[in-house]
Amino acid sequence: MTSAQNESQALGDLAARQLANATKTVPQLSTITPRWLLHLLNWVPVEAGIYRVNRVVNPEQVAIKAEAGAGSEEPLPQTYVDYETSPREYTLRSISTLVDIHTRVSDLYSSPHDQIAQQLRLTIETIKERQELELINSPEYGLLAQATPEQTIQTLAGAPTPDDLDALITKVWKTPSFFLTHPLGIAAFGREATYRGVPPPVVSLFGAQFITWRGIPLIPSDKVPVEDGKTKFILVRTGEERQGVVGLFQPGLVGEQAPGLSVRFTGINQSAIATYLVTLYTSLAVLTDDALAVLDDVAVDQFHEYK
């Protein structure tokens, strides 16, 4: 074989690629979730970062009289509605971080994607993931911490059955909004319902499909804890008007990017590194105890054999 035969007859791929522009995606962050809880909560703006929940004391003692019959002249009862003298106050909590970006990087490498914008986008997504985690698990204001012992029940046999969810509904029977649990919990309930011959219906919300029970959607969140093969089901009633659960945020922040979220440029240091402060102010309030209930110790590792 001659050297002429070894020579390329046309431009090769490797050399040609040096003149081609690759289409590049923005950075993909696998920890981003839909964060359905944030979408489903009603969000209330607060003043000075404080939200005070005033409750009635001894509501069963409010005296009301219904007329027994025509011509009754019995005296009417005297009553008043008393309030708590030390109501609970929720203080907004911050989730913050500093984002450092070298000015040389942002100057030279911001096409086609702006480096500063992408760094801030990914940071904000991570902060919002932490927000959902705190709204569920915070020992101060999380859903699980605010469920009272009277509103917490156990499963009948470990796995989440339709009977268990029915029992949970009796705790939040005044217009319940949604169940919240880990995806493994939803799968476990689907198995139990299907095994009993009552596969749960499906509803479309926000362009996604959710299974339901008694018309109430089961919302997944990987922030609901799973320990030793067990998780929890949370049933929530939302909204101020319904005396339910509400999310809290601070409006009118400097550098506001979203409700309760601000991004502020803090300066450039002597190493030419620019710094941005990203802060989210958030909390969650339960207006009445019966707005929230928890099904505890839900087994997610039980399976059935179908014959």
From Swiss-Prot:
Main location: other
Miscellaneous comment as given in the Swiss-Prot or TrEMBL entry: Detected in antisera from mice immunized with killed bacteria but not live bacteria. Cattle naturally infected with M.paratuberculosis all have antisera that recognize this protein.
GO CC entries: encapsulin nanocompartment; plasma membrane
Record-stated family: Belongs to the encapsulin family. Family 2A subfamily.
Its biological purpose: Shell component of a type 2A encapsulin nanocompartment. Forms encapsulin nanocompartments about 24 nm in diameter from 60 monomers, probably involved in sulfur metabolism. Probably encapsulates cysteine desulfurase.
InterPro entries with a match to the protein in the record: Encap_f2a, SrpI-like
Subcellular compartments: Encapsulin nanocompartment; Cell membrane
Pfam families given in the database record: SrpI-like (PF19307)
Protein name: Type 2A encapsulin shell protein
Tagged with keyword Acetylation: no
Domain notes: Has 4 domains; an N-terminal arm not found in the type 1 subfamily, a discontinuous peripheral domain (P), an elongated loop (E) and the discontinuous axial domain (A).
Keywords: Cell membrane, Encapsulin nanocompartment, Membrane
Organism this protein belongs to: Mycolicibacterium paratuberculosis (strain ATCC BAA-968 / K-10)
Subunit record text: The encapsulin nanocompartment is formed by 60 subunits; monomers form pentamers which assemble to form shells. There are 12 charged pores where the pentamers meet as well as 3-fold axis channels and dimer channels. Isolated from bacteria in a complex with cysteine desulfurase (AC Q9KII6).
Domain of life: Bacteria
